[in-house]
Amino acid sequence: MDLYLYNTLTKRKEKFEPLNPPYVGMYTCGPTVYNYAHIGNLRTYIFEDILKRVLIYNGYIVKHVMNITDVGHLTSDADEGEDKIEREAKKERRSAWEIAEFYTEAFKRDLKKLNILEPDIWCKATDHIQDFIDLILILERKGYTYRTSDGIYFDTSKVPDYGKLAGQDLENLLPGARVEYNPEKKNPTDFALWKFSPKDVKRQMEWDSPWGVGFPGWHIECSAMSTKYLGQPFDIHCGGIDHIPIHHTNEIAQSEAAYDKPMAKYWLHGEFLIMGEKRMGKSEGNFITLSDLEEKGYHPLSYRYFCLTAHYRSPLKFTWSALEAAQRALFRLYENMKKYPKEEAKYDEKYEEEFHKAINDDLDMPKALAITWELVKDDKLAPEVKRATLLQFDKVLGLSLDNPPEIKIEIPEEIWKLVEERELARKNKDWEKADRIREEIKNRGYIIEDTPQGPRIKKATPLTK
């Protein structure tokens, strides 16, 4: 069965044809480890995990590389401001190396909780400084670089199709239109390959180079490491849509300038998680971590399930009520799995084919979930066949259906039905009915709390009754 994926580079859905079948080289942009990953970041890693699982499901042998940015990512993506890790080190009064190590391990723990398969190769930027220097030297020899007072820059005007990934027009980008204006730059889109350490500041992370003491630019890191481990071109490069206009655009420019061949054949990007009216992000000051969800009683796999309810190329709005619904759905799935006998059985071919078609249509996980529930509700299928088929699906879903965690449903289903009924009344501005339902919920021993992200429900205590 053919697999089709949406390629950001060509702006269309394409049949997936790897360069060297059955092998697939896949590079994903990892975290900048100066803080905990928020659940918006984690949505992207869940999408990439689904992509990897779908590739494996289709019989491909995947070599997956993910970087860890532990130096060089400044507070502005456009080479301005302070290094995020150095800034956090000052704030927490620890070394930059300690900060990077601490948040790297925290990130890996989050991936494990979400059932995200580890990459075959983790590559830390600080372990590859010479690789970055070597790539910059190639670009320098080919005439793509120039020097300013603060670093070595890439001249984007020498790349005729610069901006092709994002569909940007170089000539129409006025100075300062997208990035902070730097009068020493030849073009507003030019970016740093190597930044010099400020003369009056002693950085914790800095290295000697042919151009002077400093540190690598953010974009050069992914170009050098992806080429080192996957060659060029490789099959798939992915990340979040925020990477398209600057980071991935600059990766393509420098990689293709250096090696005179395409960087990657397919480019895939996951959409934002929305909270309120904005995308979730540390810069927006509106982010939630996986630990925050756990503290509120949500299983990490409930968040994974929640992410599967929307297509990876569609924005997903986060509300507590939507997460509650996802957790209840997942827990019902677990309860069903526990009822099915653990007998040897073959999966149902009709359902498997429908599921396979859905995931091969650009990772259509909402449809795949709908097929999953059709299967659960199908009274004609033997329970052991249902179990075998769900386990087959779980190779992609990654919800631990073979070993469901012990769960305790604290809020009964009938209470949630009342909550949903009240939400509908509020939407229709039937305030009298909404108040009546609130009282009924209270009489049954639960308190409802309205928040900007949706209703929160909890068991009443003697103090809250």
From Swiss-Prot:
Binding site residues for ATP: K282
Protein name: Cysteine--tRNA ligase
Keywords recorded for this protein, A-Z: Aminoacyl-tRNA synthetase, ATP-binding, Cytoplasm, Ligase, Metal-binding, Nucleotide-binding, Protein biosynthesis, Zinc
SUPFAM superfamilies in UniProt: Anticodon-binding domain of a subclass of class I aminoacyl-tRNA synthetases, Nucleotidylyl transferase
GO cellular component: a single term: cytosol
GO process annotations (BP): cysteinyl-tRNA aminoacylation
Motif ('HIGH' region): 31-41
Needed cofactors: Zn(2+)
Subunit structure: Monomer.
Superkingdom of the source species: Bacteria
Residue numbers covered by motif 'KMSKS' region: 279-283
Family matches, as InterPro entries: Cys-tRNA-ligase, Cys-tRNA/MSH_ligase, CysS_C, Rossmann-like_a/b/a_fold, tRNA-synt_1_cat_dom, tRNAsynth_Ia_anticodon-bd
Cofactor binding comment, as recorded: Binds 1 zinc ion per subunit.
Gene3D superfamilies hit by this protein: Cysteine-tRNA ligase, C-terminal anti-codon recognition domain, HUPs
Localisation per UniProt entry: Cytoplasm
Enzyme nomenclature, EC number: 6.1.1.16
Source organism of this protein record: Dictyoglomus thermophilum (strain ATCC 35947 / DSM 3960 / H-6-12)
